[in-house]
């Protein structure tokens, strides 16, 4: 069954989140404290939630309202059963009913580009990393973003 999250689902949602994204526990706590919403969290439930995705509302300049698919994951015991595909298709139906123009996502690794293309996603841009060597001529300090920087970064992007 596919449905939106309820309060009783939180332990299972956090378990799924930690399995998939456990390498950054500080960020996970930050996400749940600041961004998590039941009405944005779509679940696939088999006695308990076993797959999920966040349907975060977002506005793209020149396009308008879109859904940012975030935190898409399936419990390892339930993978390769098409559950994420069902969640994505349901999210498309919900978007259409809400008048949302589309959805975007950022695949976590190269292998996921092919997976998501099966559902109509296309690559719109690439992010490249450039290493800069520090010199005395720099007027600004460049440093790795921290959790506390996320809110101000979200305002820029």
Language model regions located:
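A conserved beta-turn-beta hairpin within the catalytic core of GNAT-like acetyltransferases
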Residues: 58-69, 79
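Conserved GNAT acetyl-CoA-binding A-motif
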Residues: 88, 95-108
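Conserved acetyl-CoA-binding loop-helix of GNAT-fold acetyltransferases
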Residues: 71-74, 80-93, 118
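An acidic- and aromatic-residue-enriched active-site/binding cleft used to recognize and process polar
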Residues: 58, 72, 108-110
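Conserved acetyl-CoA-binding loop of GNAT-fold acetyltransferases
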Residues: 117-126
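Basic (Lys/Arg-enriched) interaction patch that binds polyanionic ligands
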Residues: 112, 116
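Short amphipathic alpha-helix that is part of the acyltransferase structural core
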Residues: 1-54, 64, 68, 127, ...
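Short, flexible active-site-adjacent loop segments at beta-strand->alpha-helix junctions, enriched
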Residues: 109-111, 127-129
């Amino acid at each position: 069954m596919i449905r939106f999250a309820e309060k009783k689902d939180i332990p299972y949602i956090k378990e799924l989140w930690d399995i998939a994204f456990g390498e950054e526990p500080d960020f996970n706590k930050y996400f749940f404290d600041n961004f998590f919403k039941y009405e944005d969290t779509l679940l696939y439930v088999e006695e308990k939630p076993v797959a999920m995705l966040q349907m975060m509302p977002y506005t793209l300049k020149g396009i308008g309202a879109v859904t940012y698919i975030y935190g898409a994951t399936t419990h390892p015991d339930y993978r390769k059963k098409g559950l994420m595909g069902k969640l994505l298709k349901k999210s498309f139906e919900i978007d259409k009913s809400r008048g949302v123009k589309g959805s975007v996502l950022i695949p976590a690794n190269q292998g996921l580009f092919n997976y998501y293309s099966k559902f109509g996603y296309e690559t719109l841009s690439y992010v490249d990393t450039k290493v800069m060597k520090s010199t005395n001529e720099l007027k600004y300090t460049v440093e790795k973003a921290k959790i506390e920087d996320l809110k101000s970064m979200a305002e820029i992007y």
